[in-house]
């Protein structure tokens, strides 16, 4: 009888010792940290955006992939600094990342893959304002010549 109680207590104690399931925001932070641990990463990267954005209605268990964008900061990758306190680097690299979500025993195993972002908002050149100014200048020149 005593062995049954010991077995029951061991089972209940083991169930209580299981780690809490990983949340979506925690999984994103873990994925960014995983990328920052790579040897080729000099400056740490910080989360720029995620799809979907973190919120109370987003469950990690319902996702097949983590899709997010990171940007280079001014902090060294392995300096131990809090990423939230690191400023984004001006003209820093922007990377689009994906990580398949594989849940093993309530824990997420993430294999992060990142590529350089094609849409770098810093380097976008706007052509239309230049075209409009050129047309207006040409029209004004035409009117000035026509008056003479």
Swiss-Prot record:
GO terms for molecular function: lipopolysaccharide binding. One of its GO terms (cellular component) is extracellular space. The keyword Disulfide bond applies. Residues 1-17 form the signal peptide. GO terms for biological process: antibacterial innate immune response; antimicrobial humoral immune response mediated by antimicrobial peptide; defense response to Gram-negative bacterium; defense response to Gram-positive bacterium; innate immune response; macrophage activation; positive regulation of adaptive immune response; positive regulation of cytokine production involved in inflammatory response. It is found in: Secreted. Residues 18-122 form a propeptide. This is Cathelicidin-1. It comes from Gallus gallus.
């Amino acid at each position: 009888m005593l062995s049954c109680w010991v077995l029951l207590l061991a089972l209940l104690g083991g169930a209580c010792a299981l780690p809490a399931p990983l949340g979506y925001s925690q999984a994103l932070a873990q994925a960014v940290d995983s990328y920052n641990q790579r040897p080729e990463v000099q400056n740490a990267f910080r989360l720029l955006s995620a799809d979907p954005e973190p919120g109370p209605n987003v469950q990690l268990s319902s996702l097949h992939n983590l899709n997010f964008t990171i940007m280079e900061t001014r902090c060294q990758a392995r300096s131990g600094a809090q990423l939230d306190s690191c400023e984004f680097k001006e003209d820093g690299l922007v990377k689009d990342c994906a990580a398949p979500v594989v849940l093993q025993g309530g824990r997420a195993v993430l294999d992060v893959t990142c590529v350089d972002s094609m849409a770098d908002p810093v380097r976008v050149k706007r052509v239309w304002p230049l075209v409009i100014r050129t047309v207006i200048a040409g029209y004004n020149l035409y009117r000035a010549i026509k008056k003479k």
